[in-house]
């Protein structure tokens, strides 16, 4: 039960399990219908659009790639979405997407012979290949090592450079701080806070209520400022004595 407006900024949706994050993005994708109220994409109510037509505008990468992958060949999996553009164009777009996610050497592999980390990348590539204006990523950093997280960060950067709107559900607050312009904190189905990442993560009361961990960089900065403040006070006391 809330009102919000999403713009071109990259947006991270955070909150504890059960806060309503996945429900929200499924509403945005048209996989669920709101019980009341409206969701507008541009000026058009998504209730008036089919899931198929909305898929051309809004791409959604599932948290579990196995809920999304169904082909027995990586290239065929990624080509499936843009097939309506012709096989040649679909293959070019699929290869470009696989290059972006670091799997250009696995085009002929069976997705289920690859690791969970790689399958998540296949799922991301499948949506990138469809070239939607909005990309929704559900927990993209889960099962990723530092190399995988760096690659996802680069994918977000490339998508933003192409003018895409990137929305992601995340539990990794350090990743959120470094890669997203805007943060939305959900709590029991309501927006507890939203704004620029640096500002939101400095609100201790909000983080405590939402059971979120403060990003390391901000926690370290605050600790240094606290220590500096103490030493500065001591220095003044010494000067006055």
Question: Which positions does each model-derived feature cover?
Answer:
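Conserved ABC transporter NBD signature motif
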Residues: 37-45, 54
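Conserved ABC ATPase "signature" region
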Residues: 89-106
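Conserved ABC ATPase signature
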Residues: 110-114, 118
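Catalytic Walker B motif of ABC-type/P-loop ATPase nucleotide-binding domains
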Residues: 135-138
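H-loop/switch region of ABC-family ATPase nucleotide-binding domains
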Residues: 170-171
């Amino acid at each position: 039960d809330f009102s919000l407006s999403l713009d071109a900024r990259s947006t991270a949706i955070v909150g504890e399990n059960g806060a309503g994050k996945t429900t929200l993005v499924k509403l945005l994708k048209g996989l669920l219908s709101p019980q009341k109220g409206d969701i507008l994409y541009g000026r058009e109510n998504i209730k008036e659009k089919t899931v198929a037509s909305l898929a051309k505008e809004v791409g959604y990468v599932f948290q579990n790639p196995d809920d999304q992958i169904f082909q027995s060949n990586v290239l065929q999996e990624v080509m499936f979405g843009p097939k309506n553009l012709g096989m040649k164009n679909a293959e070019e777009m699929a290869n470009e997407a696989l290059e972006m996610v670091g799997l250009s050497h696995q085009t002929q592999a069976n997705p289920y012979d690859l690791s969970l980390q790689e399958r998540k990348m296949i799922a991301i590539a499948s949506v990138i290949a469809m070239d939607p204006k909005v990309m929704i990523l559900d927990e993209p950093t889960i099962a990723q090592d530092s190399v995988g997280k760096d690659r996802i960060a680069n994918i977000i950067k490339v998508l933003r450079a192409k003018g895409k709107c990137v929305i992601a559900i995340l539990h990794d607050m350090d990743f959120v701080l470094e890669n997203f312009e805007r943060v939305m904190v959900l709590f029991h189905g309501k927006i507890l806070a939203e704004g620029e990442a640096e500002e939101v993560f400095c609100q201790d009361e909000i983080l405590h209520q939402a059971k979120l961990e403060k990003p390391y960089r901000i926690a370290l900065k605050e600790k240094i400022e606290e220590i500096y403040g103490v030493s500065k006070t001591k220095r003044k006391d010494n000067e006055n004595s």
